[in-house]
C-alpha cells in the first residue's frame, strides 16, 4: 500500500482517485501532481513502482500544503477572524452560517439539532 503524506492510499483504486484521499488534494490538483510526476492516471495504486510513488510523494511534499499543516492553517485563519472580532469571526464564534445564508429557517447543519418541542403531552386513557 502506497503511503503519501501520512495517508495510506487504497490499493485497488486508480491513482487519480486514490490521491484525492489526501486532505488538500482534489481531482484537479491530483491530476496536476500525476502530470508533473509523469505517472499514468489510469494506473492502479498496487501497480505503481516504488520510484513513481517517491516522485509523487516528493511533489506533494514540496508544492502542496496537505493534511495536518493545512488543517492547522485553516484553524489558525478561523481563530484570527474570531480574535479580531470581525463579522465572520463573530459568526464562527456563535456557530452560525458565515457566508450570508438565511437563518430564519434552515441552517440546521451549522446551528445543530433543534431543542425539545414544548407542548402538551397526551394523557393515557384508563379503561
Curated annotation (Swiss-Prot):
Q: State the NCBIfam families in the record.
A: uS13_bact
What is this protein's gene name? rpsM
According to its record, what are the GO cellular component terms?
cytosol; small ribosomal subunit
Question: What's the protein name?
Answer: Small ribosomal subunit protein uS13
The entry lists its GO molecular-function terms as: rRNA binding; structural constituent of ribosome; tRNA binding
**What is an annotated GO biological process for this record, any one?**
translation
Q: Which UniProt keywords apply?
A: Ribonucleoprotein, Ribosomal protein, RNA-binding, rRNA-binding, tRNA-binding
Subunit description: Part of the 30S ribosomal subunit. Forms a loose heterodimer with protein S19. Forms two bridges to the 50S subunit in the 70S ribosome.
Which ranges of the sequence are coiled-coil?
A: none
Query: Per the similarity annotation, which family is this?
Result: Belongs to the universal ribosomal protein uS13 family.
Q: Which organism is it from?
A: Roseiflexus sp. (strain RS-1)
Q: List the disulfide bonds.
A: none
Protein function: Located at the top of the head of the 30S subunit, it contacts several helices of the 16S rRNA. In the 70S ribosome it contacts the 23S rRNA (bridge B1a) and protein L5 of the 50S subunit (bridge B1b), connecting the 2 subunits; these bridges are implicated in subunit movement. Contacts the tRNAs in the A and P-sites.
